[in-house]
């Protein structure tokens, strides 16, 4: 199952948290879910070059808090905050006038973010860079930045071949079955003249130890 299930979904509630954090009754659930989808799609389309990895959404009554994780906060914020203000007004229009608050968080090491790595490989494939070169360079950067393991996979008409195929490379460890293993996963698509090429990335950053156990050990040391 470790090869089939989404690495983040497999770890939700254990070491990973939900990207949408709110509760709704049966009547409102569908509406809120569609709103979340529209918010994420609009932000990704408008700020595709800003290196946005994750968009978290929290709700309270008529207020929505949107947390944007980006490698280039300057592009999102804009000059004197004009970019954030324009984005906030657009999102309020999408959600039917609900109060939107935006929180921009910088990704300190984009080389260790699986989504950004996948998007970077996809962007290079669109520029006709060799898929092997793009994958190996991305893996080398991740390992230099402190990753304990990385796996990249591309699927499609690689190099313009008549028959689609899948190729992958792996360096280090990727313990998919270990729930405490902090594995980041990303997916992107490259739109080439030959069709779409799917890019998947797994990055292993180390184990996340439970906080309760750590607290108990400290108490025992005293």
Swiss-Prot record:
Source species: Caldicellulosiruptor saccharolyticus (strain ATCC 43494 / DSM 8903 / Tp8T 6331)
Protein name: Small ribosomal subunit protein uS3
Function according to Swiss-Prot or TrEMBL: Binds the lower part of the 30S subunit head. Binds mRNA in the 70S ribosome, positioning it for translation.
A molecular-function term among this protein's GO annotations: mRNA binding
Source species, domain of life: Bacteria
UniProtKB keywords: Ribonucleoprotein, Ribosomal protein, RNA-binding, rRNA-binding
All residue ranges annotated as the KH type-2 domain in the record: 39-108
Family, as annotated: Belongs to the universal ribosomal protein uS3 family.
InterPro entries the record matches: KH_dom, KH_dom-like_a/b, KH_dom_type_2, KH_sf_prok-type, Ribosomal_S3_C_sf, Ribosomal_uS3_bac-typ, Ribosomal_uS3_C, Ribosomal_uS3_CS
NCBIfam families recorded: rpsC_bact
